């Protein structure tokens, strides 16, 4: 029999509210609506299907404060991650939302009504408390970045009535709700289930450690990867799921099943490990593997880990009895070539030869097309990874030129376009500042916010083209550091490489060589908000390349850019 849910009762709101579907659906059409973001959709799905039991809605302030301060809901239940619905003051005011109001929660993807929320309270989001107590306070932490840049200023708490399931069009047969997975376990006759959480592809070592964990406990394996939001730069879930499916036949017959979890990860380390254990308990698992630096975001810009390597294991162990799910500590295994087997590192005698490939080395081999040995990963898995991660010489990239008007950006961009077209191998797209203003941003002015929006539109186009394998050359003025950082994140977040080139031509030179007289007009006050005259240009903090047309020829600058790309592997090496 599957493990009992957290809190004793599976809060399957979809099943609970199904008899009232027509009534709720009709009411939802008459209510004001909040259109949910991708992360909010992930949270709502797991609230409605019981994955977040005992939650029945988004957290009130009492729940939020208790979870942040003590990992406790207001009713005393253990819960480690704030699950909140953020909204702007404008949305709240426009819809006249207040305690007691009912509001429809709507899917941004297809405009479907998903649920009705009865508002219990509206409270200001204490982002500082959440950042410090839940995630550790480092402003570079991805969850804290999200808090500070994406989350609105108010949280809305209240219980939910389910109207419709979210629509999914990928891997539908693998998207088990907690109730469905419990039925599946019963059908298979499984009573002991070891759940394995992952957001990465699995290789032979992962197969070995999960089999060992199951064998030691006379259990079966639930491979339960996250297919919601993970860490920026992770391999997309389509590729990962194909790789998991290819791996599944390598398990002993009937030992493992694959189920997909639509979770929006926060990369919250110890707090997240407790949360993951609760979620797996709700899905019926009796055991849960917690790895080294479980759900950690890696290192900050100083090379420091956000969490200690065993903080997550210690956190889950602290609440072992209350969680009601047995923690299985992730064993680091290594390959022994002399005996062609994997063993836990702490069981390998001194002097025995071992082999390992790090994640960084694997990415490098995928990037360069270098051999990936069968002792590390199965050929069918490697084939799938290579299909989605072609060698860098065939990948796209974005060259983002920034500098004053008339600094030489356009000349460099055009010359670079010709050079790359001559090189061949990928399509080349040119996004000049004036062209973008005319074709994409004609309605925008030159306020700070409009300039930021213009750069983000460029980044969106560049990211999509780069992901498709094109070379993109963008050449806006882009005077603000926050806009350039956001552009880099947008392109990198889609898996593309972004190179920031600061065309650091002095303002005096730009003015002196301005044949159109634009600077002169700005000096006379005929043009307002002109970069370098009455609006600042913030020099980039971390440019990949700095050039200067007053000291270098366009030809030599283009050569520098080509050399930079060549050193990063973007051209075939004979």
UniProtKB/Swiss-Prot annotation:
Allosterically inhibited by 3'-phosphoadenosine 5'-phosphosulfate (PAPS). The record marks 203, 206 as: Transition state stabilizer. GO terms for biological process: cysteine biosynthetic process; hydrogen sulfide biosynthetic process; methionine biosynthetic process; sulfate assimilation via adenylyl sulfate reduction; sulfate assimilation, phosphoadenylyl sulfate reduction by phosphoadenylyl-sulfate reductase (thioredoxin). Pathway: Sulfur metabolism; hydrogen sulfide biosynthesis; sulfite from sulfate: step 1/3. GO terms for molecular function: adenylylsulfate kinase activity; ATP binding; sulfate adenylyltransferase (ATP) activity. HAMAP family: Sulf_adenylyltr_euk (MF_03106). It comes from Aspergillus terreus (strain NIH 2624 / FGSC A1156). It comes from the Eukaryota. It is found in: Cytoplasm. It catalyses: sulfate + ATP + H(+) = adenosine 5'-phosphosulfate + diphosphate. GO terms for cellular component: cytoplasm. Homohexamer. Dimer of trimers. Residues 395-574 are annotated as: Allosteric regulation domain. The adenylyl-sulfate kinase (APS kinase) is non-functional. It is involved in allosteric regulation by PAPS. PAPS binding induces a large rotational rearrangement of domains lowering the substrate affinity of the enzyme. The record marks 330 as: Induces change in substrate recognition on ATP binding. The active site is at 198, 199, 200. This is Sulfate adenylyltransferase. Its main location: cytoplasm. ATP binds at residues 197-200, 291-294, 333. Sulfate binds at residues 197, 199, 295. SUPFAM superfamilies: Nucleotidylyl transferase, P-loop containing nucleoside triphosphate hydrolases, PUA domain-like. Residues 1-169 are annotated as: N-terminal. Pfam families: APS_kinase, ATP-sulfurylase, PUA_2.
